[in-house]
């Protein structure tokens, strides 16, 4: 595809890069291929930060283990994905924390560790901060994984079936099973306060938020 569609004069590849069926293509294969097709090849070494190699594998592990800030730093951008707003149980609204239930568009979407996150969503070009819970909602005895976000500011109507972009900025805490709904609401208020403090920093700019 690369050769047919782009006719490259030079290919830049990482030293440990693999590709193709069952990752059978490696740098040695690429060297032979480029030589036979009169294409220049530049092999670059690993990018490091404090002797730690920055790689896609490491970034995936960071996301899956909840180290979102570090993952975003290594990505050089904010980890996020597209999701469709789907119908939920309506419980959040009863708790005075209405949420939009999200279904990732990609079937095999990489998802973060279960927990509560400070997020930013792009909805019809509008940027809205919020707090997101990814988990099974153990307080209510449920077992299905649910991704839901409470957006700060005025409640947005008619979000169902909309496609939004959701970014994970900070991990706030683990998902907890509370002994009562009142205890859950009390914690949600603390989470919101925490997220609003972070929101103020992010509104000053991404660099300020990481200091």
What role is predicted for each listed range?
Residues 88-211:
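Phosphate/ribose-recognition catalytic cores of enzymes acting on nucleotide-derived substrates
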Residues 1-98, 124, 179-183:
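Classical nucleotidyltransferase
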